[in-house]
Every structure is written in structure tokens, then in C-alpha cells.
Curated annotation (Swiss-Prot):
Its cofactor is Mg(2+). Its main location: cytoplasm. Its EC number is 2.7.7.3. The gene is coaD. This is Phosphopantetheine adenylyltransferase. Belongs to the bacterial CoaD family. Keywords: ATP-binding, Coenzyme A biosynthesis, Cytoplasm, Magnesium, Nucleotide-binding, Nucleotidyltransferase, Transferase. ATP binds at S10, F11, H18, G89, L90, R91, E99, Y124, S125, F126, L127, S128, S129, S130. Pathway: Cofactor biosynthesis; coenzyme A biosynthesis; CoA from (R)-pantothenate: step 4/5. It is an enzyme of class 2 (transferase). Signal peptide: none annotated. Substrate binds at S10, K42, L74, R88.
Amino acid sequence: MTSIAISSGSFDPITLGHLDIIKRGAKVFDEVYVVVLNNSSKKPFFSVEERLDLIREATKDIPNVKVDSHSGLLVEYAKMRNANAILRGLRAVSDFEYEMQITSMNRKLDENIETFFIMTNNQYSFLSSSIVKEVARYGGSVVDLVPPVVERALKEKFQTPLK
């Protein structure tokens, strides 16, 4: 049986922290779908298509990663892909509390889906897409925070010179 996992998020934009979780998940599972979810509570900076393109470029060297988007429930997407696992990265205890609520709801919706938590690498424990955008907005260097394709996209969006 093929083991298929879903790594979902808004990825607005994808960071090196996200990429670390995806790479580590790809070592454990046969296939990993990186799925951009349309979060109605967030106003995206990059369009869904832009985010998909950025993720595709950032993950192009990971052969068992596929990139997609979805606007419904994650468990429905997982069923559609015959996935048996959801991957979630944890930066801190505060992440766990939120993720536990989501995991409980997903389990209520589909008891066959397991959630796997991966602790983020310490060097990314402070990192979030929001922080990256804030740093880039004011011309700060994000070179150690995001893949090169994302750095270029941020500079273009904010029209700031590369540092």
C-alpha cells in the first residue's frame, strides 16, 4: 500500500520552515501532496496560482512531492487522494494547542486519517509567513528565511532591491 500524506497550509508564502517539514515528510511517506488551502479568515498576499508556482519551484527537486490547491475541507481532499496522513509542523507549544483542535475535528470528520506532527528545526522555530512578509516589506533580507524563488517574488511585489 502506498503511503500518502497531505501537507496543507496557506503558504503565503512558503518559507524554509515549511520546506523543512515537507522534505522530512517526503522521506517518510511515498507521496506528499502540498496543498494550498483557501483560508477564508486570511487575506492572501500572493494569489493561489502564485503560491502554487512558488511551491512547485521550491519543491521541484523532491520527486515524491505534488502540489495542488483545495477550497473545501482537508479531510475531503485527503479522501480524494487516498491519503492516510496529514503532516503538521509544530514550532512551539502554542502551535500544538491550535493543531490539536484541528486534529480532533479532522478525526471526527474521518477517523481513518492520522495526523503526524513534526517538530520544526530549531533554526525555523520563530519563522512564519507573516514575519517574512513584514521583513520583506521594509527591505530586510529574507535570504535565510525563504527559498530563492520566494525572495525574488517578494522583492518584485514590494518593489525593493535585492540585498
